[in-house]
Curated annotation (Swiss-Prot):
It comes from Brucella melitensis biotype 2 (strain ATCC 23457). This is Elongation factor 4. One of its GO terms (biological process) is positive regulation of translation. It holds the Pfam family GTP_EFTU_D2. It catalyses: GTP + H2O = GDP + phosphate + H(+). The gene is lepA.
Length: 602
């Protein structure tokens, strides 16, 4: 089964969201005969419905293509289709480490975007050869010459011999295959007889086969019947089957050096298979591990609660199943006075949060409420200890805290000139510090340091609406810095609502509090008594709105008669309302929570 090393090419496709990399992958599969016409469907590698609908790739996928080149030789091309979105950058990093080259796909009508940059720099860090592919050249707006110049200016790689294609119509696809064979390097030397050393690229759960592990063999041979050992965790498993994706699962006898394939080994949980771990044979282990990956750290936290408390156990089961497939998603139980039992969940970013929420609602038919997203704060206590704060409601007494540190990010924004002023204003409003501003033709590239707290709220939506969708945004975490942060509580009828408490910067507290109170005033229905809605910092009220009471006309049955009769009825009503306000409970509808947390829509 084994293919000579110089006839193997391992490559990934790197691009910004929507520049057509999944479509290009479809064409490559079609042209090399991976699937026949009947089995072909659009974005064949995006296996989740949500991936296909949103037109984004979430999990990295792999395919083995067999291609007979124009020089008459047979080649094996292993393609890894990577996600383009910033939240899934860790999926990109591990996919790139399994390859020697990359196709950089750039939309010929739009040019280089912020995430193109981030992913290309990752590819360059992995010493990849890069073949530039200009896609969508059939569009009337395509400007291949301008985009080539832009690639050379911004990224600094030679684009003079870029392959011009249209993945949609299939134009130029064969040139891409030839470029892969001729320009990308074969895998570095691997020894079939050396002890087994393989990198764990990805893993996911299959209800029939257990955990399927995607591996890239470096030295030695992986075959059925071996007992393998994960060097990071020390766990041992017998290999049950080895195979490749074409993109259908096809079993093969063994996987040799340089090859990409999958194994199953009756592994029960994805958490047991750490991405970036080294797999070796238990009987004859390799000496040195591969330089490992950092496991992905959750960045954004929020509470997920079932709308109906009876769904709690179903939600627990559903989250367990998603965790099987997505080790970067973490959750633990929490309770809230307003929302009952639920979970505190950690995500890689806002898109990750949205996708998990949508998958829970879709695949498991659950109705959920999410609380306001928050980031991980570091608390330096007066007694010299340090704590991590995931949920603003758990914040200890202010007297015990010496200082609070919050995470900051380095953000790169690319935008047409026309929107530059508005975007800079937005960044300044969000306490941003400008680091750099460069021009590339008619587009500007700005680098800002921003507090993550200000970005998780609604920054991305605002950026897109200010720039009419033209600006693109990419970020990575830089460090923790001390900030003047305060906890803001929301009181409804003088009762604190824990699900709405948040940490905000002192300068923005009043504005944010007022906006939230106004929003709740619209959303909470009137009761028989008046309801005050207040935003408080410590003991100080910074904003207040009042929902007026519903009034029943108690004097309607008095026709004429003495005024004292009317007054008596009105006084009696007033007394009842006072008592009602004292003992009455304000029911906050679920919609009010959901809307109040989408503060960015005003």
């Amino acid at each position: 089964m084994s293919t000579p090393l110089d006839h193997i090419r391992n490559f990934s496709i790197v691009a910004h969201i929507d520049h057509g990399k999944s479509t290009l992958a479809d064409r490559l599969i079609q042209l090399t005969g991976g699937l026949d016409t009947r089995e072909m469907k659009d974005q064949v590698l995006d296996s989740m419905d949500i991936e296909r609908e949103r037109g984004i790739t979430i999990k990295a996928q792999t395919v083995r293509l067999s291609y007979k080149a124009k020089n008459g030789e047979d080649y094996v091309l292993n393609l890894i289709d990577t996600p383009g979105h910033v939240d899934f950058a860790y999926e990109v990093s591990r996919s790139l480490a399994a390859c020697e080259g990359s196709l950089l796909v750039v939309d010929a009508s739009q040019g280089v975007e912020a995430q193109t940059l981030a992913n290309v720099y990752q590819a360059i860090d992995n010493n990849h050869e890069i073949v530039v592919v200009l896609n969508k050249i059939d569009l009337p707006a395509a400007e291949p010459e301008r985009v080539k110049q832009q690639i050379e200016e911004v990224i600094g790689i030679d684009a003079s011999d870029a392959v011009e294609i249209s993945a949609k119509t299939g134009l130029g696809i064969e040139d891409v295959l030839e470029a892969i064979v001729n320009k990308l390097p074969a895998p570095k030397e691997g020894d079939r007889n050396a002890p087994l050393k393989a990198m764990l690229v990805d893993s996911w759960y299959d209800s029939y086969l257990g955990v399927i592990v995607l591996v890239r063999v470096i030295d030695g041979v992986l075959k059925k019947g071996q007992t393998i050992r994960m060097m990071g965790t020390g766990a041992k498993y017998p290999v049950e089957r080895t195979g490749v994706f074409t993109p259908k699962m096809v079993q093969v006898d063994d996987l040799g050096p340089g090859e990409l394939g999958f194994i199953t080994a009756s592994i029960k949980e994805v958490a047991d298979t750490r991405v970036g771990d080294t797999i070796t044979e238990d009987r004859r282990p390799t000496e040195n591990m591969l330089s490992g990956f950092k496991p992905a750290q959750p960045v954004v936290f929020c509470g997920l609660f079932p709308v109906d408390a009876a769904d709690f156990e179903d939600l627990r089961g559903a989250m367990g199943k998603l965790r099987l497939n997505d080790a970067s998603f973490s959750f633990e139980m929490e309770t809230s006075a307003a929302l009952g039992f639920g979970f505190r969940c950690g995500f890689l970013g806002l898109l990750h949060l949205e996708i998990i929420q949508e998958r829970l609602e879709r695949e498991f038919n659950l109705d959920l409420i999410t609380t306001a997203p928050s980031v991980v704060y570091r608390l330096n206590m007066t007694d010299g200890t340090h704590k991590e704060l995931h949920n603003p409601a758990d914040m200890p007494d202010v007297v015990k805290i010496a200082s609070i540190e919050e995470p900051w990010i380095k953000a790169t924004i690319m935008t047409p000139d026309d929107y530059l002023g508005a975007i800079m204003k937005l960044c300044q409003e969000r306490r941003g510090i400008q680091i750099d501003l460069t021009y590339v033709g008619p587009r500007a590239m700005i680098t800002y340091d921003l507090p993550l707290n200000e970005v998780v709220f609604d920054f991305y939506d605002r950026l897109k609406s200010i720039s009419k969708g033209y600006a693109s945004f990419d970020y990575n975490l830089s460090d923790y810095r001390e900030g003047d942060l305060v906890k803001m509580s929301i009181l409804v009828n003088e009762e604190p609502v824990d699900a709405l408490s948040m940490l905000v910067h002192r300068s923005a507290a009043e504005k944010r509090g007022r906006a939230l109170c106004e929003k709740l005033k619209e959303l909470i229905p009137q009761h028989m008594f008046k309801i005050p809605i207040q935003a408080a910092i410590g003991g100080r009220i910074v904003a207040r709105e009042t929902i007026s009471a519903l009034r029943k006309d108690v004097t309607a049955k008095c026709y004429g008669g003495d005024v004292t009769r009317k007054r008596k009825l009105l006084e009696k009503q007033k007394e009842s309302k006072k008592r009602m306000r004292q003992f009455g409970k304000v029911e906050i509808p679920q919609e009010a929570f959901i809307q109040a947390l989408k503060m960015g829509d005003d």
